[in-house]
Amino acid sequence: MARHGGAYVIAAVGSASRGDGLAALGADEVVVGLKGVGGPVDVVLDTVGGAHLVAAWGLLAPGGVLHSIGWASGEPAVFPVNSTFAPGASRTLRSFGDTTAPAADLALLVDLVAQGALRAPIGWRGSWRHLGGAIEALRERRVPGKVLLDLDRL
């Protein structure tokens, strides 16, 4: 979606194999870890949390925004003293918690998928009755892509 909106997209992954297919999805660069990101960057979407979130903060340009949208590491984010202060326009950290009605956003996503401008590869599909297995696969990082749960009858 960022690429669709005109952004230059850098996808940072935990291992080279996790980057397979990301260029085809719109990433201009795929790097392993944040050390490969030259910075500064305007926007970061972080799903890892912990030390990764702190490192991502350090990549922000003045006026940049870091969106914390997950906490896969399960570790605390500990910022060094004074690391959140810098000259220039303020940098911002936001957490995922928007509770506004998603209808308009979902309609946009459906439209982009219908146009072929947005793809969401499915890495695991199964009955909602196997939710535990799906969650385990996600936590163990065995799913490249999205999990799709089919709702069947009891």
Per-range role (PLM):
Residues M1-G33:
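Mid-domain Rossmann-like dinucleotide-binding core that forms the NAD(H)/NADP(H) cofactor-binding site
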Residues A12-S17, G33-L34, T47, G70, ...:
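N-terminal Rossmann-fold cofactor-binding loop
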Residues E29-G33, R125-H130:
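Short acidic-hydrophobic, aromatic-tinged amphipathic segments that line or gate anion-handling sites
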Residues V44-L45, H67:
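N-terminal Rossmann-like NAD(P) cofactor-binding module of classical short-chain dehydrogenase/reductase
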Residues V37-V44:
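A short acidic, Gly/Pro-enriched loop at the edge of an enzyme's catalytic core
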Residues A51-L118, L151-L154:
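Glycine-rich phosphate-binding loop and adjacent beta-alpha segment
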